[in-house]
Regions:
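Accessory terminal helices/loops
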Residues: 1-157
Length: 157
């Protein structure tokens, strides 16, 4: 009901995902799913997939498709410093977004290292709630990033 109440007063999905928590007496753990995912599912079930945020949502155009162009526009050193600062402020998800832009067209080694570090931190933190999906995804991303770093090292030798 909290999700529907939020929808009815105009809150967006991400806002509700941050705000809503289960009362302790209803919490049974999040080993298979999360409260955030349930909120997202309810939100999209009621409102549909179109979030009214951008015209591009109506077309088959991935937001990530512009990452290479953004990467060409940015100062890499400033962007890498921003990622490092975000990590230090524990703003890991923002740091992932910026890292993905930097990595999108040239697999920047420093950005890959920071991307790896972020995922390792998130994996360590996720062990507390032991959500299987999150743990497995983070392990997958860590392995994939290590492989990219190893490929980069192999190509320079």
């Amino acid at each position: 009901t909290k999700t529907v109440e939020g929808i009815n007063v105009g809150k967006d999905m991400y806002e509700l995902m941050k705000e809503i928590v289960l009362p302790k007496e209803l919490s049974v753990g999040e080993g298979y799913g999360t409260v955030e995912w349930a909120i997202r599912s309810i939100f999209e079930g009621y409102t549909g997939w179109f979030r009214h945020n951008s015209t591009t949502e109506l077309y088959s155009y991935s937001p990530k498709s512009i990452f290479p162009e953004l990467n060409d526009l940015i100062d890499k050193e400033m962007a890498l410093k921003m990622v490092k600062d975000l990590i230090e402020k524990n703003e890991y998800l923002k740091a992932i977004h910026i890292s993905e832009i930097i990595i999108s067209s040239d697999n920047n080694k420093e950005a890959l290292k920071m991307y790896l570090k972020i995922h390792q931190i998130l994996l360590k933190e996720s062990q507390k709630n032991s959500n299987r999906w999150i743990v497995k995804w983070l392990e997958f991303e860590i392995e994939k990033t290590k492989n990219k770093l190893n490929e980069e090292a192999d190509s320079t030798t």
